[in-house]
Swiss-Prot record:
Species in which this protein is naturally found: Saccharomyces cerevisiae (strain ATCC 204508 / S288c) (Baker's yeast)
Protein name: Factor-induced gene 2 protein
Propiece residues: 1589-1609
Lineage, broadest ranks: Eukaryota, Fungi, Dikarya, Ascomycota, Saccharomycotina
Localization: Secreted, Cell wall; Membrane
GO cellular component, one term: fungal-type cell wall
Amino acid sequence: MNSFASLGLIYSVVNLLTRVEAQIVFYQNSSTSLPVPTLVSTSIADFHESSSTGEVQYSSSYSYVQPSIDSFTSSSFLTSFEAPTETSSSYAVSSSLITSDTFSSYSDIFDEETSSLISTSAASSEKASSTLSSTAQPHRTSHSSSSFELPVTAPSSSSLPSSTSLTFTSVNPSQSWTSFNSEKSSALSSTIDFTSSEISGSTSPKSLESFDTTGTITSSYSPSPSSKNSNQTSLLSPLEPLSSSSGDLILSSTIQATTNDQTSKTIPTLVDATSSLPPTLRSSSMAPTSGSDSISHNFTSPPSKTSGNYDVLTSNSIDPSLFTTTSEYSSTQLSSLNRASKSETVNFTASIASTPFGTDSATSLIDPISSVGSTASSFVGISTANFSTQGNSNYVPESTASGSSQYQDWSSSSLPLSQTTWVVINTTNTQGSVTSTTSPAYVSTATKTVDGVITEYVTWCPLTQTKSQAIGVSSSISSVPQASSFSGSSILSSNSSTLAASNNVPESTASGSSQYQDWSSSSLPLSQTTWVVINTTNTQGSVTSTTSPAYVSTATKTVDGVITEYVTWCPLTQTKSQAIGISSSTISATQTSKPSSILTLGISTLQLSDATFKGTETINTHLMTESTSITEPTYFSGTSDSFYLCTSEVNLASSLSSYPNFSSSEGSTATITNSTVTFGSTSKYPSTSVSNPTEASQHVSSSVNSLTDFTSNSTETIAVISNIHKTSSNKDYSLTTTQLKTSGMQTLVLSTVTTTVNGAATEYTTWCPASSIAYTTSISYKTLVLTTEVCSHSECTPTVITSVTATSSTIPLLSTSSSTVLSSTVSEGAKNPAASEVTINTQVSATSEATSTSTQVSATSATATASESSTTSQVSTASETISTLGTQNFTTTGSLLFPALSTEMINTTVVSRKTLIISTEVCSHSKCVPTVITEVVTSKGTPSNGHSSQTLQTEAVEVTLSSHQTVTMSTEVCSNSICTPTVITSVQMRSTPFPYLTSSTSSSSLASTKKSSLEASSEMSTFSVSTQSLPLAFTSSEKRSTTSVSQWSNTVLTNTIMSSSSNVISTNEKPSSTTSPYNFSSGYSLPSSSTPSQYSLSTATTTINGIKTVYTTWCPLAEKSTVAASSQSSRSVDRFVSSSKPSSSLSQTSIQYTLSTATTTISGLKTVYTTWCPLTSKSTLGATTQTSSTAKVRITSASSATSTSISLSTSTESESSSGYLSKGVCSGTECTQDVPTQSSSPASTLAYSPSVSTSSSSSFSTTTASTLTSTHTSVPLLPSSSSISASSPSSTSLLSTSLPSPAFTSSTLPTATAVSSSTFIASSLPLSSKSSLSLSPVSSSILMSQFSSSSSSSSSLASLPSLSISPTVDTVSVLQPTTSIATLTCTDSQCQQEVSTICNGSNCDDVTSTATTPPSTVTDTMTCTGSECQKTTSSSCDGYSCKVSETYKSSATISACSGEGCQASATSELNSQYVTMTSVITPSAITTTSVEVHSTESTISITTVKPVTYTSSDTNGELITITSSSQTVIPSVTTIITRTKVAITSAPKPTTTTYVEQRLSSSGIATSFVAAASSTWITTPIVSTYAGSASKFLCSKFFMIMVMVINFI
């Protein structure tokens, strides 16, 4: 049993140790550095010791200005505005790349014993640092000529972290390869096809041969992104020098030679692999947007190799021979360009390395040293000459560009929306089923009088015609740049030869072709149209005649054999729905450059001196002229949809989307060349040493007459294998911008209305859109007295109907009345998944040995001087590896979501007295009996509201609406083929008082969610040891967040629509009242302009005594109006400076009506009524107001003014939330407001400025500090702004976070939630060898709750970002979090602060506490000794702080191995302490107040009839006068809202927070807060992780187990 117990105990101990170790490892944070991968492989025996150190600096700066003028016209419903926008954008981008590398390797030479070891081991050391800084500052200015002005977008800048990886590779000659991957924004490729034929100058018949050389040279020039202009596209700007483009010039040539005699002979083939970039490239272009006239740059060209056959002059006494020389020319050009004087000064510093090769001859002498390891082979020395030249040239860039564009304007005319309506067409098929369709139609009314009988027709024509049209654009761009060449330059060594070169004079022509979709319009045949004269009579009685074409149709109706013909017409003013799209536009351009380089080296002597080798070489040459012609085709294809407009409209919702779409693709060429070169030569040269010039030789020709006899025995083998592989995939660039998408969603709910008429209950089921947030119960009593005279057989019997109707309706309405979504999605990207891949494989292997014997013979003295020189040189493998991988990702996602706007009427007092007098004259058989109906409705209600921040007290001001309308309806009732016309004339008088101020707009619930995605791409550069190439991978990740600027405002919710004939009379019944409460927080005045109406058709069927009468009526559709109000109020403020703040708003309203049918049966008579319910309009609010608290308000207003002023800010002395109202004394137009003395500061105040700006800037540099600044401000929504600035020098770091104090003031908003989350990921490798930067997301959660009882509960918990920086192991920066919890509860009389706790780290200070239970904290302390941790103490703390001061020490033994045995070599003491703290906070119960809303509605309609007279001529030439009328029915609804307060008590759950903390030790700090919250209130967990390291013990588990077993025993 003891053994089993021992095993169980051992298992427990092992399990505990495993858990403890896991816990220790959990807190360990190891900082790993990313090593630069290094690959060194030497497998050749003749690899000499070599070291290469290169420093590469690259900097480029470019800027472009993009002006554009955009003009758009938007027409929807009754809103039409034109806003030509002129935008000018300028960007200045500068980048710098500095790379330095050091590499050294060593291996033995020809040691067979150690060759195996050399090929496997190599010592290398490297040091690489890379810094890339990019700064972009666009400046945008916009101007609009409309009534509103778009906000100016603030400058934004983006940061681009970069990481560079350097890889060094050295392989054997048979597997040497070089790869180069690059990605550029543009590519320019050229192909040179040339054919040359050369004949050697030898006179030997056997060696006399000629060969033709054909080759293809392909050059690819990839410059930086050039300037882009919207009006003119420049393929390649000729005004900029080549070096200022900061591009890579890749030149590859392939020469294939074929001899004429078809003999097997190796022809020299040269592959110029200059695509490996120049060793040193310093390019800087200073061309700011302001326009500088001076540009200085220096440019070092890559080594260029030229080959030529030089024929030696032959003589009878000298055996001629042919030799070939390959020269390598490298130059450094330092030029400065002064644009002001248009002159350029160029300084050349060039060096020529000439490598002659000798042909095979008799081997006379062999250097014994060169025989080692090879068989009779030696390598000829390389002679290098340096020369410099200076030249001045007039750089006269004359560029002329002419562009012509032709556009065909198009215009579309549509019907006035007031003349259209939605018509429900019921179609009955043969089976008897009814199908209803809804379509827009044009309504017209015609009245026909025949023999004194007036017949009125109401017809409509469906709007079904469409017109599609497209725009044709043709443009041509031509540019002719001119540049003068250099005046001339000479080699500063000998005047016997000249070297002249002329600049390139490119001639580029661009031609563009575009394809567009034509549009055509279909119209009616002229045979179906006629000219109709429309006579319009206004209210004054004047007649206006207009002539318009109309579409005439004839309808024939046969009833019992009687044929009736109807003639109707529709004016030809149908609307057109159109979709405009440009299908494609293809632009192909060909740029032809004709460079001419003439190298004149006459027959004279070219003497080159080299100071390094102290040798002078004289070469006799003949004339050689090189001329090349380059044709550079550039193709560009793009597909662009300039403007795509799609408009669709449904009965309940409408959507409008417009977006420009542009996509383009570019392509480049791919070149793959494989070549092998083997050639030899014979020449005379001085003996030189490349590495260490210890021997000086001089060879001078005394005179021209002297002939040189030389005998050279040289054997040389050179193998050049070059593989150039370039892959450049098509570059896709798509720019899709969905600027505005408006979709309206209507929520309808069913309601049941019970009507009791004379004791008979009738139930109606109707539907109306949701327009409130509560249950509405309306009870109304209406008494209607109707006097109707029914005539039958010339006898009329009057009938009096008295109807008492009691209506009770309960409508459950949803919380969202309408939804307006303004989404702005900008997707801009340039993707090149495969980037550009260039692989260059170059292998050079050369072995040579030569023995030369030279004899100088002079013709005058006949003396000969002989000298011998022999040189053996071996060139090892030179391999290059260039690999550059660039990935470019443009990802921009921006979305703006605006939820719906809830509006309700609060705290209003409505007193209305309405008297309606309807006089109806019923005529039958030429007898008219007048009927007078008088209805007096008086309603008075005083609702109450608990909110006081935006309390609206309405003054007793009445606005009387007086209208006089006359309705004339003519109905023809047909029965048994006998039709009796009936004319009904209705004269209506209405005088309606209207409250001046009836509504107060609440705060809008607008939440903004803006997501930004910043993707940082890395770059890798790999280049070899022996070549100082420029590894350039400039990856630009552009982050552009397009800000959609919209203006929105709330609609004036006044339920009054007036026609043009109405009169507005504003009277003030109480001008001398001193107790009339008045608040200027929000005021609306009646619109005084005439508004056209849109009508909806309805049909009513009435059956009286078996006679069915069909009435066709229509009700107006409330138009969508645009109100741009700008109010400027000057206020005299005490203790404040007088300020004048303008306020502007833009509102759009769309109200539609839907038809409903009600059937009523009274005394067996069935009556069908067709009614309509208005669809609640969509409205958005956006106001810009900056006000301050006022103690004295002076208001000057007129009844006809349209002003909107919304105050959303309060000062420190704001009104108390206890319900106090400010009372003002008004006298005339001056009001003095009395502010109560009691005031309290609200818990939170929301104050924001009306601007939307997003800006971020960053810069990374090794020498200066790194700054990352981001500012995000989104207004007028809930404040979500954060400013983060991180400074990261090489050794220290600092992070400061400033969050604006959340402030909120609301009076009607139940709940508003705003969450702002910003994530910044910055990566820059390598920053430093001992530093790592980590930024955590910054999240800020703000929730504002506003209850109806003036009880405000605000909680703002912002988690500060944690920063982990470990520049060294011993230094750790810790930033403690701060938590602030504030709860404010207000009662009807006072406000008191219950709990206010401020916590800093783990210490909390209690400011004021009335909680029922104080927080109890239980602290558990865990002690770790060695690898065992156990719980030692447990303490309970009351209050808000617990202190643990115990410190525990633990020792660890670290073992080190030396030799075969191991012994303890070091003992260290580590301190570790972990504290587990649990805090429980039980808050007190919160009592809030709920509001029950009751509303009562009263509806009275106003009918307006406008007479219209049509005059037309029939086929007989007789004039026919037809009188029609348009009827307007305007419902006036008065709603009284009553509120009732109900107390609601809620008890939050206790909040438990548990966190574990490691106390400070020598190894660092690791703290983790874990918050477990379960409550109904707001709890924000705070998670902070700090960089540190925990001690990891090098003890064996087995050792610990044995110790435990021994102890147990």
